């Protein structure tokens, strides 16, 4: 293993009183909460793209980060060095999973065959790294949005040859994900949307991407991939309007093409912000629709209208999010992946550790608070009491199809229903009593 981060041997749990910046204050992987270890609840993952591929560039400036593996004259040698350093980081951080896009791990090359050869070479490397370290792949995916060929979309492209090239990438990425023991496969429609309706056939593009997803499901079953397929909702950016706008929109799409039993969602906090929702809302919606799959843990900036991909730092926000996950029975094949990047001015390599350690502690403390809320059942009891009338005779007749508008009109003659307080202020105080205890 490399020793790029030679100042750190291993990040360990030292407790809330520790002043060691390279120690966990709240994340104790083996601590049992609600019958599961903290590690099993959170299933933490580090993303390859922001952590090891981004060079610090933005729309107004070139890269600011000094990454030795990005300076290699041989791109494939650079990819191998990147894998060495990535697994050093993962091992020292002590997280069980990682995630990647195909072109994160291997250079795309100048032809399809070169792409395949490079990709397979690095998949061999990752397979060996996983065997050596015990680190696993949470999910893989294909980047069908960066290359200029995808400027008008991949599955929604007006050119079927580009559709085919995207299909080939997904074919290779799915096969690699299965080979590496990946527990999920993610599809994010980065450019599956439009800039203007003046040159867009909405019905056709919707049918194209519907067929693409059906082909993905068909291939999953053909190769015997046992993981979960996930769509990641996002309302806009890079396109003006994306077809996977939010969780509810994705569910409608899945229903239209008969895929609601085959595909779930990977929810990103920052994407919820862009869609005008809370993180909690998107998770609760997915759970209610039985399509909650996995989480991209990050945060956005409410004052900015773009995907800032900052590390999560709010125990208040994440306690409510994890509470919804726990209510839904927890994550199965999914996990909490840090789809987040350090800031452009954070040029010290060890800033990567500070960012992840802080975020992991935020999620760990949020898990503790959410678990206590669920265990006490105080909040849930109030909600159940609020809807208790639906368990009575009238409520059951309505829900079971044994009533009609005419029957309701007759029943209403003998009813004088009175409003009951929603107790929002009390409930907010109750939640704060758990968070800040």
From Swiss-Prot:
Q: Name one GO biological process term.
A: D-xylose metabolic process
The enzyme class is isomerase
Residues recorded as binding Mg(2+) 1, renumbered to this chain, are: 232, 268, 296, 339
Under catalytic activity, the entry for this protein gives: alpha-D-xylose = alpha-D-xylulofuranose
Q: Which cofactor does it need?
A: Mg(2+)
Protein keywords: Carbohydrate metabolism, Cytoplasm, Isomerase, Magnesium, Metal-binding, Xylose metabolism
Query: Which domain of life does the protein's organism represent?
Result: Bacteria
| Transferase in keyword set | no
Record: active site:
101, 104
Q: What is its EC number?
A: 5.3.1.5
What's a single GO CC term here?
Answer: cytoplasm
Entry's InterPro entries?
Xyl_isomerase-like_sf, Xylose_isom_bac, Xylose_isomerase
Primary subcellular site in the record, as a coarse category: cytoplasm
Binding residues annotated for Mg(2+) 2, in chain numbering: 268, 271, 307, 309
> In the record's cofactor note, how is the cofactor described as bound?
Binds 2 magnesium ions per subunit.
Protein location? Cytoplasm
Any S-S bridges, and between which cysteines?
none
| Any one GO molecular-function label of the UniProt entry | magnesium ion binding
Coiled coil residues, start to end: none
Family stated for the protein in its record = Belongs to the xylose isomerase family.
Looking up HAMAP family in the UniProt record yields:
Xylose_isom_A
What is said about its interaction partners and assembly?
Homotetramer.
Name the UniProt record assigns to this protein: Xylose isomerase
Gene coding for it: xylA
């Amino acid at each position: 293993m490399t020793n790029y981060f030679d100042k750190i041997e291993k990040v360990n749990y030292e407790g809330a009183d520790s002043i060691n910046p390279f120690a966990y204050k709240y994340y104790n992987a083996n601590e049992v909460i609600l019958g599961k270890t903290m590690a099993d609840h959170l299933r933490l993952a580090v993303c390859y793209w922001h952590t090891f591929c981004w060079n610090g560039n933005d729309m107004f400036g070139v890269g600011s980060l000094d990454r030795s593996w990005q300076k290699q004259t041989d791109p494939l040698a650079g990819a191998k060095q990147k894998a060495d350093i990535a697994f050093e980081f993962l091992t020292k951080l002590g997280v069980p999973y990682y995630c990647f896009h195909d072109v994160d791990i291997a250079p795309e090359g100048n032809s399809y065959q070169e792409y395949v050869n490079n990709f397979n070479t690095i998949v061999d490397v990752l397979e060996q790294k996983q065997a050596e370290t015990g680190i696993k792949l949470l999910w893989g995916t294909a980047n069908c949005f960066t290359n200029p060929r995808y400027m008008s979309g991949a599955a929604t492209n007006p050119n079927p040859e580009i559709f085919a090239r995207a299909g080939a990438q997904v074919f290779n990425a799915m096969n690699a994900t299965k080979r590496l023991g990946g527990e999920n496969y993610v599809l994010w429609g980065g450019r599956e949307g439009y800039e203007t309706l003046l040159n867009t056939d909405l019905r056709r593009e919707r049918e194209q991407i519907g067929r693409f997803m059906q082909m993905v499901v068909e291939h999953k079953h053909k190769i015997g991939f046992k993981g979960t397929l996930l769509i990641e909702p996002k309302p806009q950016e890079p396109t003006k309007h994306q077809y996977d706008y939010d969780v509810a929109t994705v569910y409608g799409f899945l229903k239209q093409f008969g895929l609601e039993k085959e595909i779930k969602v990977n929810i990103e906090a920052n994407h919820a912000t862009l869609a005008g929702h809370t993180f909690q809302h998107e998770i609760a919606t997915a759970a209610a629709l039985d399509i909650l799959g996995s989480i991209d843990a990050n945060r956005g900036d409410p004052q900015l209208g773009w995907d800032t991909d900052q590390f999560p730092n709010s125990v208040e926000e994440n306690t409510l999010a994890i509470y919804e996950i726990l209510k839904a029975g927890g994550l199965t094949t999914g996990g909490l992946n840090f789809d987040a990047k350090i800031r452009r001015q954070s040029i010290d390599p060890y800033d990567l550790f500070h960012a992840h350690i802080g975020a992991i502690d935020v999620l760990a403390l949020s898990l503790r608070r959410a678990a206590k809320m669920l265990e006490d059942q105080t909040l849930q009891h109030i909600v159940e009491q609020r809807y208790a009338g639906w368990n009575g005779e009238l409520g059951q007749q309505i829900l079971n199809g044994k009533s009609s508008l005419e029957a309701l009109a007759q029943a209403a003659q003998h009813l004088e229903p009175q409003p009951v307080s929603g107790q929002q202020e009390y409930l907010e105080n109750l939640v704060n009593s758990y968070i800040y205890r």
